[in-house]
Amino acid sequence: MAGPKLDGYQLGSTIGAGTVGTIFSATDKATGQLVAIKRLHASVSRDPLIAARFRREMTILARLRHPNIIAYYGGGEDTDGNLFYIMELVEGGSVRDLITATGALPWQVVVNCGRQICSALQCAHNHGVIHRDLKPGNLFLTRDGVVKLGDFGIARDVGASDLTAEGLTVGTHAYMAPEQITGDASISGKADLYALGCCLYEMLTGRKPYLGETFPQLFEQHLRATPPKASNIAVGCPPELDQVIVDLLAKKPEDRPFNARNVQAKMLQIAEKYQIAELATASTSTGKVADVSAGQVSDIGQRMLQRHIEARLGTGQRGEITWRKLAVLLAVIVVLAICAMLVRN
């Protein structure tokens, strides 16, 4: 890439670009590790508020070490003084990519993703961080079906001064909790739970819970309307999952589940009840499900998620089918050759 260089890294292709920055793939020259690098555009690196938000994002990511959160490897300024940071490279796309490619996802996949997202949210909330922009596009996927929460660019750190002016609305409109829309200064992790409800609804049905065509219409629906139950659209949705989504989409924060860990436990209970997952360490019936990572659960939903990722990327299952067809073809050729030899004899 022409222009500023990052010492120690070989920059690769552009993964994504926005109004304030670009994300590149890169290789650590010393270790050969593939990483992603997020760098602010030169035009905004000197903007005090944008720079402060970017530095805040780095500070937050440095604190949040969790298997379901994008890993942070450090950051600083490039040779031209533009801010950047280095993070884990996740190559399976995003939940948004999956929804775009397949539409509605199987409820087993939704339960699995929900459990993993809750694990990430609980870690963030335990550290006093409210994401404020939870949406399918910020839920990244590894090739083996691990969900990674990323993009903490507008996250709120309750232990630091707020960079958002009081009464200002921040977030993505389709996933914003009522208290975000009204600019409530006392916003809590319950806002992320509302956004989680929107995400689960969309994953399960292939559509957002509210379909307003303008921002005012959308805000009005978030504040006062009730969406159709997910089970009215998604065939086979367990009633327990339906109820979890209804609870998450409650208008008042106090009417939503107590915390992300509580929702995670409900997801595990659904998985166990319908025998799609087996908890390797402790049953939800013990009441001791604290923070269950992907590696602790043998989950049909995760294997289904992995197959969806492979199908979208054109890897895995397609390759296996090709090899099976090749093996059958070779076997047929061998049989035909033997038959030909027998006929000649």
Residues of each region from the PLM?
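C-terminal lobe helix-coil module of Hanks-type protein kinase domains
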Residues: T172-E278
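Conserved N-lobe ATP-binding subsite of Hanks-type protein kinase domains
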Residues: T22
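AlphaC helix of the eukaryotic protein kinase fold
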Residues: H41-R63
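Protein kinase catalytic-loop region centered on the HRD/HxD motif
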Residues: S119-V129
